[in-house]
């Protein structure tokens, strides 16, 4: 209670006229942003390999989409891009607005937010919510903080890995944490392949996890392992985000051998000052 007033959570986007859900008095639940407002629609969907949407069942995590007459007409495009015109390309599908948020709707109609769709780990077309991994690891007494991301993988596109801040000064035991995760996470595909110790989870200026830094680290690790396996252990790998994509720069090795070593990974590689190339 603040100044004798109750704070009730809601949820919405400007593109859907701001308010889509609201918590009614007496319906407060941890993590919930309430239920849908009159005239609005909200549901969770999963995205198939072909891009199609499938409605989630009650309590199943998916991407939240908003429907109804409050969904906006579209963005006015830049004249340099052929505008001015109103465009909803890639944002609204069949009247439903892609929020970019992950969440679920329970069997009572309450909506819960769990994360951002861009943080999904997609393993062989299977969507994995990193919160499932993070919550499982945070339940271990040796873990003070945790973050999960996808690591590039030749077979599945990416596989889950986790970064944890140890809770104490004792030795870090990855084997124990992997075994814990194997028991605590019911879905086999969501169990992390590796767990790395880290001094602190990188954060944004507003205190949210900054996962691009962890994605870069995971990519550097997998590229370094591949180069070492190809007898290129002296090669140096660094990572940087350029124009919205992650680019790895490899120095100290023959470009053709580097390309062969990382073949099959969805990585963008630059050998020294050369132009960045997507690995086959």
Per-region residue spans from a language model:
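Short, well-ordered coil loops that connect the C-terminus of an alpha-helix to the N-terminus
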Residues: 4-5, 13, 142-143, 187, ...
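A short amphipathic beta-strand at an alpha->beta junction
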Residues: 193-196, 269-280
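Generic structural signal for residues in well-ordered beta-strands
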Residues: 7, 42, 146, 194-195, ...
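Conserved AMP-binding/adenylate-forming
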Residues: 1-10, 14-111, 117-120, 133-134, ...
């Amino acid at each position: 209670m603040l100044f004798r007033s109750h704070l009730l959570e809601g949820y919405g986007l400007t593109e859907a006229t701001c308010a889509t859900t609201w918590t009614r008095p007496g319906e407060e639940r941890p993590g919930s942003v309430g239920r849908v407002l009159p005239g609005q629609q909200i549901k969770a969907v999963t995205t198939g390999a072909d891009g199609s949407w499938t409605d989630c069942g009650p309590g199943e995590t998916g991407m939240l989409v908003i429907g109804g007459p409050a969904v906006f007409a579209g963005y006015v495009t830049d004249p340099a891009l052929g505008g001015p015109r109103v465009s909803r390309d890639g944002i609204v599908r069949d009247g439903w607005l892609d929020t970019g948020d992950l969440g679920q709707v329970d069997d009572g109609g309450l909506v819960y937010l769990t994360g951002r769709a861009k943080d999904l780990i997609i393993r062989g077309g299977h969507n994995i919510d990193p919160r499932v991994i993070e919550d499982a690891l945070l339940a271990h007494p040796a873990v003070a903080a945790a973050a999960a991301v996808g690591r590039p993988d030749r077979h599945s596109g990416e596989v889950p890995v986790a970064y944890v801040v140890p809770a104490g000064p004792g030795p870090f035991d990855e084997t124990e944490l992997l075994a814990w995760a194997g028991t605590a996470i019911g879905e086999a595909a969501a169990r992390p392949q590796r767990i790395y110790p880290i001094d602190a989870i990188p954060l944004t200026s507003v205190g949210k996890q900054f996962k691009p830094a962890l994605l870069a680290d995971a990519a550097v690790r997998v590229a370094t392992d591949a180069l070492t396996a190809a007898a290129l252990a002296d090669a140096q790998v660094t990572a940087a985000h350029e124009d919205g994509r992650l680019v790895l720069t490899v120095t100290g090795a023959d470009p053709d051998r580097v390309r062969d070593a990382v073949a099959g990974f969805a990585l963008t590689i630059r050998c020294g000052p050369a132009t960045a190339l997507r690995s086959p």
